[in-house]
């Protein structure tokens, strides 16, 4: 038996309202959450057409020649940045004027694998063996309204299609629990002199990958308590007269404890690394995750929070490097420091839902630009007054110094002078020196943790 997809009714209305306007097809993304028993779809969004495609797509004879995988995968990557923890791009859809043919299903299959590969390439985390590895393709014939729903195993490029059930349900968007936390980070990334061929972006990602292990191995307090991962998240909540568990609050406070010292099983000798500089990433970020309220497990909730922490930090660094590349900012002299504004997080309510999506705003961007970007990427209208700015401006400091000092310095006094309440500071220090990167084995039986939250 194939998987079952429980779909918010408004998604069905959205798909029905898409007008082909003489085009051969319209494609897009399906967004929601996987669970062991079934998947939940709460949002569908069409891929915005390229301007140069507007004329070509009006001719049905073009068929699938105009299904631009590169454009569709770029859209998927942009949308993936806007999803909080717990939500994923579950698959792709296509609405056509033609009856189902193998060409359409093959094209959908290729598109689905391309989208998944593109999104996964930028993640700091990997799916576990226990997680659902199937993704969905949905084909709708505009003339007959017939639906063809199939899934593929993303871990097997040669997997064949499996039929799946597509069921609409009202009120799905209100059946979600939220988890919120503020995470303070202080990441030091040495830039190896032997890896000069690596770009700054690649070096930074390598450093973030090491930091990600700390987040993965952290201890997570939910409403101040450490809970067994196999417990029900709503355990201890009041029950209704019908015996159903009712959450007294739809929001949970999460705090993170990261391991400060290693135990004796992780002995390591000191290593010396020749470095040309270093990157320091410091500050606080607001994180938010959502999980469906149907028998939620603690481990699923914690996993959603972990992934939101990793995603939001990695996405901001990537956006900063993209901005620097696009604007072609000239390098400063060796003795000068350079400050750049990192994007800060803005949450946006999904219309008719308790779930909030997010976007990122640079300091020189207006609220109108964020609204327009949201509408372009997700094809849904929002109001400017609904934007929730969760953070203060985050600032990046890039400095260059050709002296021979060690780069394991304290940068607290080198932050910008303007008042910043919630700051993510990225300091890039260029120098000719030696960094002693070492790990000390701890013989004590206990494990120390560093309090890593607000």
UniProtKB/Swiss-Prot annotation:
Membrane association type: Multi-pass membrane protein
Predominant location: membrane
Localization per Swiss-Prot or TrEMBL: Membrane
Keywords noted in UniProt: Membrane, Transmembrane, Transmembrane helix
InterPro entries: ODR-4-like
Tissue specificity note: Ubiquitously expressed.
Disulfide bridges in this chain: none
Record's GO cellular component terms: membrane
Gene Ontology biological-process entries: protein localization
Keyword Membrane carried by entry: yes
Protein function: May play a role in the trafficking of a subset of G-protein coupled receptors.
Family assignment from sequence similarity: Belongs to the ODR-4 family.
Annotated protein name in UniProt: Protein odr-4 homolog
Organism the protein comes from: Homo sapiens
């Amino acid at each position: 038996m194939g998987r079952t997809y429980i779909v918010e009714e408004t998604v069905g209305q959205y798909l029905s309202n898409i007008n082909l306007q003489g085009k051969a097809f319209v494609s897009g993304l399906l967004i929601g959450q996987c669970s062991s028993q079934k998947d939940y779809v709460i949002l569908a969004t069409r891929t915005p057409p390229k301007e140069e495609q507007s004329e070509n797509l009006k001719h049905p004879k073009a068929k699938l020649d105009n299904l631009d995988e590169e454009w569709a995968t770029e859209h998927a990557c942009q949308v993936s940045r806007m999803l909080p923890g717990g939500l994923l791009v579950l698959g792709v859809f296509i609405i056509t004027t033609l009856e189902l043919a193998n060409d359409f299903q093959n094209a959908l299959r290729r598109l689905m694998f391309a989208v998944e590969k593109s999104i996964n390439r930028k993640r700091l985390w990997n799916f576990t063996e226990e997680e659902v590895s199937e993704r969905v393709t949905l084909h709708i014939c505009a003339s007959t309204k017939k639906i063809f729903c199939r899934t593929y195993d993303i871990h097997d490029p040669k997997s064949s299609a499996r039929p799946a059930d597509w069921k609409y349900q009202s009120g799905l968007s209100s059946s979600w629990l939220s988890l919120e936390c503020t995470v303070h980070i202080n990441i030091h990334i040495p830039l190896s002199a032997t890896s000069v061929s690596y770009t700054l972006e690649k070096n930074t990602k390598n450093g973030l990958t090491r930091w990600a292990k700390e987040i993965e191995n952290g201890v997570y307090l939910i409403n101040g308590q450490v809970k067994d991962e196999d417990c029900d998240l709503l355990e201890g909540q009041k029950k209704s007269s019908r015996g159903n568990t009712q959450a007294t609050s739809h929001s949970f406070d999460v705090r993170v404890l990261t391991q400060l010292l290693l135990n004796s099983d992780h002995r390591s000798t000191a290593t010396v690394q020749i470095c040309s500089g270093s990157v320091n990433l410091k500050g606080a970020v607001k994180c938010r995750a959502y999980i469906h309220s149907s028998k939620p497990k603690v481990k699923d909730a914690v996993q959603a929070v972990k992934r939101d922490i990793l995603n939001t930090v990695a996405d901001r660094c990537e956006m900063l490097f993209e901005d620097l590349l696009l604007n072609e900012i000239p390098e400063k002299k060796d003795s000068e420091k350079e400050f750049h504004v990192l994007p800060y997080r803005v949450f946006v309510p999904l219309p008719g839902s308790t779930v909030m999506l997010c976007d990122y705003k640079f300091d020189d961007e207006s609220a109108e630009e964020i609204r327009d970007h949201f509408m372009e990427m997700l094809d849904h209208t929002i109001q400017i007054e609904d934007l929730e700015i969760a953070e203060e401006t985050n600032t990046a400091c890039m400095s260059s110094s050709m002296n021979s000092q060690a780069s394991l310095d304290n940068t607290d006094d080198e932050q910008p002078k303007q008042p910043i309440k919630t700051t993510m500071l990225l300091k890039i220090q260029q120098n000719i020196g030696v960094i002693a990167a070492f790990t000390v084995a701890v013989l004590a039986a206990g494990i120390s943790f560093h309090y890593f939250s607000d």
